UniProtKB/Swiss-Prot annotation:
Name of the protein described by the UniProt record: Pyrimidine/purine nucleoside phosphorylase
The keyword Protease is assigned to this record: no
Family of the protein in this entry: Belongs to the nucleoside phosphorylase PpnP family.
GO MF annotations in UniProt: guanosine phosphorylase activity; purine-nucleoside phosphorylase activity; thymidine phosphorylase activity; uridine phosphorylase activity
Gene transcribed to yield this protein: ppnP
Record flagged with keyword Glycosyltransferase: yes
Length: 93
């Protein structure tokens, strides 16, 4: 079943769905700075645009462009900077 989600006053929108192997969501982030929290481990794949990310336990920002992905541990917070509208796929678990 599809579920539409909206965060940060509409600046981030996603659609959750049952992926082939794990739950997932696909969405778009508007230009801005965000902090997300995870309940379970996540794999974030950048579809279009770029995400500059401060991952848990890291001290330097990393930029991930279209076609690249990064892992986020569960039960953690991470920061994201978006300089152009960016589409992503997030796989949970």
């Amino acid at each position: 079943m599809l579920a539409v989600n909206e965060y940060f006053e509409g600046q981030v929108k996603s659609i959750s769905f049952d992926g082939a192997e794990k739950p997932a969501s696909v969405g778009v982030m508007e230009v801005g700075d965000y902090e997300f929290g995870t309940a379970a481990p996540e794999v974030m794949q950048v579809i279009s645009g770029a995400l500059t990310v401060m991952l848990p336990g890291q001290t330097e920002w990393q930029t991930f462009n279209a076609g690249e992905q990064f892992d986020v541990i569960g039960n953690a917070k991470f920061q994201v900077k978006v300089e152009t509208q960016t589409a992503y796929l997030c796989i949970y678990g």
